[in-house]
Amino acid sequence: MDWKIDTSDLTATRYYAYSASDALVVLLRRICSPYATRRFDSSSCNKMSQTDYPQYEIKTGTDVSQNRDLSFDYMKKPTKSTAKVLRGVGVIDEWFAKRLLGPRGSNPDLPFAALLCRDELYREWITLIRMLTLVLKHVPKAKVKEAHDMILELYPNYRRRNIFIPEIKESDIHDIKNALRSLVRQLSSRTNILEWPEAAKYPTLFEELVREKRSQETQKTSSTKNLLNRRNARKRRRLSSDMAAERPAGKWKNRLRSTQ
């Protein structure tokens, strides 16, 4: 099935144009945004109805174009009010649903979120996004900005491709996993993510992250020990050379034998 949406027949007077980057910005930036009124919960997406869709509402009087955090490439329909409703990943415009299912589709009332949740790649992607959200809450305060900036670097890639949500690729999963690993590495060594309540929901993913974190800490400890051993070896050699210069050769050899 071709998930590309042909927007050639859209008119500025009738439709909003939702792109994948719009949905991703809403989802990933919801933590930073003071305008996010609800949060997306993919765990119940298979039971979603039209009224269950999470919505992100911009307060009345807010000009979207002047808010960089919530700027989107909409084809806006004329309205007297500047209040808009921004829709998250679990939400799709009715027009898009009709285009995908056809005007006489077998189930035109099926929520689009339910269609997405049937896609294995999408389910993995949204799980990783939720994991990023969880880990961000535990990142040390000194590294929060750095962590957010790292995640926000994912945006240009999505925008350049102008993708629609179901066109998520394996490379997207790989990129988000790398971002997740980087965040986990920034957590304190005293933080045991297996103790988080969410660990029961994603046991495999959490265990994988813990193994990688422990492996990294082991390598770091090993490299630190090797560095200390090299430093101590240099000190011993320097001390030996100094003592050899100060003492007669015969006595120094006997001293070496006794210490061995």
Swiss-Prot record:
Region entry Disordered, spans: 213-260
Keywords: Plasmid
Bias (Basic residues) ranges: 250-260
Domain of life assignment: Eukaryota
Protein name, entry field: Uncharacterized protein A
